[in-house]
Structure formats: C-alpha cells, structure tokens
C-alpha cells in the first residue's frame, strides 16, 4: 500500500469543525493524503468495505449506502508529537451521514512509541491493538483519539461509510 500511494503528496491535516476556536495544533497534528477510488486502488476500497460490511452485519445493522470519502492515509510524526485529540467523526452537513469509521494500522508497533488509538464507549475506554495490519471498525459517533506519538512514525488508513439518518 505504501509504495502504491507514494506518488500522492502529503499535506497538513485540517479539521472539519472547530467550533471552540482552538488552534489546529491543539486539536490535531498530522499529515494526510487522500487515496482516490480508481482502477489502481479499487481493490483496497473493496477490501476495506468488506471489513465494514462484516462488522456492521454482525454488530450494528446500520443502513449503509456508500463510502463517503476517499481513503485517508495519515502520518503522525514523533518529532512533532503528532496526535489527534478526542473527537467524533460525525458533525454537521456532509459529516452527519457518517455511520461507521474504519482504521487500519499500517506501522509496525516497534517503529514508533505512543500513538495509541483509544475509543470511548458506554463500557469505558479501550486501546486498540498496535499490531501491524489490525483493522478496527466502530460507530462514527464514538469519541476516539490518537495519543501523541513520542518517537518514530505512526501510519494508518481511515475510511468512513454512511447512509441516511439513524432511525
């Protein structure tokens, strides 16, 4: 995956909503690139959507209609203390249709320190395995964060699927 998308440039991540007026680096510090859905990357979209469908069919039974965005390839650099504070992947306007979020752990856990993906639910907080290749799917309304990376480089893929309003 890394080699396949290497020609796509990274840029500094933005956030969709910043109602509190926080400076961006207080909320998130990472670099991203968007992997287009095309003939080259179609296999990746198909595979990730299979994971989403399996998780949804077994756990939530949401009405999913489509992938809502391109796949986000994210880098958190230890020399920048890269992180993404507590947030939800839903919000106003187009973000209102997100129902499931998917994260793929691309980095080997020995390549970085810190950078835990933590998810909060009614059952408390859970830290996701750092094992390379781990795929986690969760409802987009759950609070989650990536703790500061204190060394090395953490890389991941993120994808969202959605549909009409919850019923």
Language model feature labels by segment:
Residues 1-135, 141-167:
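Fe(II)/2-oxoglutarate oxygenase catalytic core
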């Amino acid at each position: 995956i890394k080699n396949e998308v290497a020609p796509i440039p990274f840029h500094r991540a933005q956030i969709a909503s910043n109602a509190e007026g926080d400076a961006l680096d207080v909320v998130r510090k990472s670099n991203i690139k968007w992997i287009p859905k095309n003939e080259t990357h179609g296999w990746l979209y198909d595979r990730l959507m299979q994971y989403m469908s399996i998780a949804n069919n077994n756990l939530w039974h949401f009405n999913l209609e489509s992938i809502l965005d391109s796949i986000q390839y994210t880098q958190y650099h230890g020399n920048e203390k890269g992180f993404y504070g507590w947030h939800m992947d839903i919000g106003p306007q187009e973000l209102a249709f997100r129902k499931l979020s998917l994260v793929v752990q691309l980095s080997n856990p020995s390549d970085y320190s810190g950078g835990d993906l933590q998810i909060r639910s009614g059952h408390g907080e859970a830290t996701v395995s750092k094992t390379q290749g781990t795929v986690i799917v969760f409802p987009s309304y759950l609070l989650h964060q990536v703790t500061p990376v204190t060394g090395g480089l953490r890389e991941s893929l993120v994808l969202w699927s959605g549909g009409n309003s919850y019923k």
